[in-house]
Design a protein with these regions (language model features):
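Juxtamembrane C-terminal module of membrane proteins
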Residues: 23-50, 256-257, 278-289, 333-378
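Long helical/loop segments within the catalytic core of UDP-sugar-dependent glycosyltransferases
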Residues: 28, 108, 117-118, 128, ...
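Cell-envelope/extracellular polymer assembly enzymes that use nucleotide-activated donors
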Residues: 49-52, 82, 227
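A conserved acidic beta->alpha catalytic loop
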Residues: 70, 86-95, 111, 138
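Short, acidic, metal-binding catalytic loop of nucleotide-sugar glycosyltransferases
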Residues: 69-80
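Catalytic donor/gating beta->alpha subdomain of glycosyltransferases that bind UDP-sugars
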Residues: 152-185, 220-224, 228-292, 349-355, ...
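Acidic helix N-cap motif at the loop->helix transition within catalytic regions
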Residues: 62-66, 80, 91-100, 143
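Short aromatic/hydrophobic "clamp" motif used to bind/position activated sugar donors
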Residues: 131
Length: 378
């Protein structure tokens, strides 16, 4: 019984972090052999759709000049790109500084109710079909808007997820380095997910939706971008992923600040699993159920439990004299945790990320507003 439980936990951990990527790659490889995708053509300037770039900002006075300089460098006709900043609850100089930019429409409410509420507030004031949501502290590449407009030519695409690139200010910036490695891995899975059928969610750094597909999500939603994009999948549309439109931001200042983010994301992941549980039904959503459970649900729920159960189970099996195989695996596990304690980047961030899932559980039960403390960036 103990050996069975050990191997079950091992299988879940390996499948979540290695196996799914391999299976996904093989499925995409077979799909490429069976079908030939027709590439979408570039759009000439006279046929480009109107797009609204919406930024939800809370007390972002320090970053406005840099963000607006980046926005003005976007390669898109100015008469077709509308700029909206939603600054609900801001009590610094955010609104004053934005008033210096005549092209920006500021939407403001004195009450701070969280990002989900701010997004809904902003969407109501927008009338373009395509809405490009991004964060104040993320910088977009100049071609980003053209790329998402090109992908939105496909009527089956309801959302576009851009790539997130995490920058580190120095080689010693372990939080940013660890986060950057994670997002490289995550971007690979997103690209393959999108090629198989649909990406499993979009990150708020660069999330583009068709306005009419926006769902009225609850104000206490923690992962608003993820829920909004996956609700679009629930309606039968796809999330396209592209690395040609990307958002750049600096990583958290340190692991303590990064823990704030990971804790919120873990809590939001658990919340999302419950609110999107209908997508796990393989009879209604066969491909999406496979992708959603494999890519998201496992790592947000059972996999961290299985990961940290491996050492005690393995120890009991070694003490019971079950065989040399268990002794070898136990030694490898101890070496892995020792490398994390010694500061080896990959193992340390992997353990750190999974530990924060448990902290996220406590965060979820203690947070009912959808608001959070921002992590300080490097």
């Amino acid at each position: 019984m103990m050996a069975t439980l050990f191997w079950l936990c091992m299988a879940i951990v390996v499948y979540t972090y290695v196996g799914y990527g391999i299976v996904l790659y093989l499925l995409v490889f077979v799909k490429r052999l069976a079908t030939k995708a027709k590439p979408l053509a570039d759009i000439t300037d006279d046929r480009l759709p109107e797009v609204t770039l919406m930024v939800c900002a809370y007390n972002e006075e320090d970053i406005i000049a840099e963000k607006m300089d980046n926005t003005r460098r976007l390669d898109y006709p100015s008469d077709r790109l509308h700029l909206v900043w939603v600054t609900d609850g801001s009590n610094d100089n955010t609104n004053v500084l934005l008033s210096a930019y005549p092209e920006v429409k500021v939407i403001y409410s004195p009450e701070r109710r969280g990002k989900a509420a701010a997004l809904k507030h902003g969407i109501k004031e927008i009338d373009t079909e395509i809405v490009m949501m991004t964060d104040a502290n993320t910088m977009l590449n100049p071609e980003a808007v053209r790329e998402v407009a090109r992908l939105m030519q496909d009527p089956t695409v309801g959302c576009v997820s851009g790539e997130k690139k995490v920058m580190a200010r120095s080689d010693s910036d372990e939080a940013a380095q660890g986060e950057g490695l994670y997002w490289k891995y995550e971007s690979t899975l997103k690209r393959l997910d999108s090629e198989l059928y649909s990406a499993m969610g979009a990150a708020g750094e660069l999330c583009v939706i068709r306005r009419q597909l926006m769902t009225d999500i609850p104000d206490d939603t923690l992962l608003d971008d993820f829920i909004i994009s996956m609700e679009i999948v629930k309606k039968g549309y796809k999330i396209a992923y592209t690395s040609n439109a990307y958002a750049m931001e600096y990583g958290s200042a340190d692991l303590h600040e990064e823990s704030k983010r990971k804790r919120r994301i873990a809590a939001g992941g658990l919340q999302s699993c419950w609110r999107l549980r209908s997508l796990m039904n393989p009879l209604r959503h066969p491909v999406v159920a496979f992708q959603f459970v494999s890519h998201r649900v496992l790592r947000w729920t059972i996999t961290p439990v299985c990961l940290f159960a491996l050492v005690p189970l393995n120890t009991l099996l070694v003490l019971s004299g079950e065989g040399i195989v268990y002794t070898i695996i136990w030694i490898l596990q101890i070496l892995f945790y020792a490398s994390a304690a010694a500061g080896v980047r990959i193992s340390k961030y992997f353990i750190f990320m999974n530990l924060n899932v448990f902290r996220g559980m406590a965060y979820l039960f203690n947070n009912s507003t959808g608001m959070w403390e921002k992590a300080k960036r490097a």
